[in-house]
Each structure stands twice: as structure tokens, then as C-alpha cells.
């Protein structure tokens, strides 16, 4: 299998003050670890950037909208304005197929929104989806963020997404 890393909404508004997700520092370290290993393996890296509506912290052009980890040469930046990256970018699955990508490692924010929906979108388009446990996060809602993320992992695993510790994820080089 040829792997790609999809970093979803790894934007300043989620990982930096004033509105970071709980455990932002450890999530950032996990995301950086995945990114460095993907780059080291020559895997394709896809940075997904959410375009929030006017006035939101991720409104295009604002500081909160900026990527935490700038894209390197050859890496893709795709923008979206809905939870499923694939629905927002109809050509993405075909572009990945053209690059012989069969597996997408998914990490980022928020577990119960864009991470979950993009994982489902990957499956819908015939890709193997791997959710990097420990490298996705959300905000506290009716229960702690960690409980929400764990529930999403269980739900996605039941739907066919592989859930693997970010430390155990390996990457195969893109052709």
C-alpha cells in the first residue's frame, strides 16, 4: 500500500491560545511526529485547511486560519468549508488514485467533526483509512474531549476505519 498523511484542520485556532483544544501541547507533538515521519518516508502529505465563516477564528486570512505546520514543497494544501474533506474536494480521491495512494493516515481536529467525516469519506472512496490515535482531538462538550475522541475511535473502528496509535503508524513512499 502507498500511504499519505492527511492533517485535518491543524490550524492555529485549534492548537494555540486563546482557544486551543485540551492537551494541545501533546497533540501538537504527536502531529509533528507523524509529519516528520511521513516526510522522512517520502509519503504524500495533505494539509487540510478549514475555511470558517466570517467572524470565526478560522476565517480565511486570519491568524487562526493559518496552518501550524507550513507545507513543504510537493505537499498538498486542500481547503474545505464542510466536515468531509472528500465531499469538499470532489477531485481529491481521483488525484490520490492517480498517485497510487491506497491508504490515508488521518490526524488533526476535531475528532467528532472533520476527522470523523473525512475518515468516512476516505472509506466511501475506496481508500483504507487509518485514524492515528493520540493525534486527533476535540473540545470538551457534554463530556471531556478525551472521552469524545475515544468514542469516535470506537465508532469509526466499527465502520471499518483502522485505529492505530500514532506511534505505530508507518508510511510507504508515494510513487
Name each region found by the language model.
Residues 3-4, 32-40, 58-175:
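Active-site-adjacent betaalpha module
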Residues 5-10:
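N-terminal nucleotide-binding beta1-loop-alpha1 segment
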Residues 13-17:
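Short acidic, Gly/Ser-rich segments with clustered Asp/Glu that frequently serve as metal-coordination loops
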Residues 19-47:
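A short alpha/beta connector and helix-capping loop motif
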Residues 50-51, 109:
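Short, well-ordered beta-to-alpha junction loops that form the rim of enzyme active sites
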Amino acid at each position: 500500500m502507498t500511504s499519505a498523511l492527511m492533517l485535518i484542520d491543524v490550524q492555529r485556532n485549534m492548537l494555540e491560545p486563546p482557544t486551543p483544544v485540551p492537551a494541545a501541547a501533546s497533540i501538537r507533538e504527536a502531529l509533528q511526529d507523524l509529519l516528520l515521519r511521513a516526510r522522512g518516508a517520502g509519503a504524500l502529505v495533505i494539509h487540510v485547511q478549514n475555511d470558517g465563516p466570517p467572524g470565526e477564528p478560522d476565517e480565511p486570512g486570519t491568524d487562526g486560519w493559518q496552518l501550524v505546520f507550513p507545507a513543504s514543497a510537493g505537499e498538498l494544501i486542500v481547503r474545505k468549508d464542510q466536515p468531509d474533506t472528500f465531499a469538499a474536494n470532489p477531485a481529491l480521491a481521483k488525484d490520490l488514485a492517480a498517485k497510487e495512494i491506497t491508504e490515508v493516515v488521518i490526524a488533526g481536529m476535531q475528532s467528532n467533526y472533520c476527522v470523523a467525516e473525512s475518515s468516512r469519506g476516505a472509506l466511501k472512496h475506496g481508500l483504507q483509512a487509518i485514524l492515528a490515535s493520540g493525534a486527533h482531538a476535540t473540545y470538551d462538550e457534554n463530556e471531556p474531549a478525551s472521552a469524545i475522541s475515544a468514542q469516535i475511535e470506537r465508532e469509526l473502528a466499527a465502520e471499518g476505519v483502522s485505529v492505530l496509535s500514532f506511534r505505530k503508524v508507518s508510511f510507504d513512499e508515494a510513487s
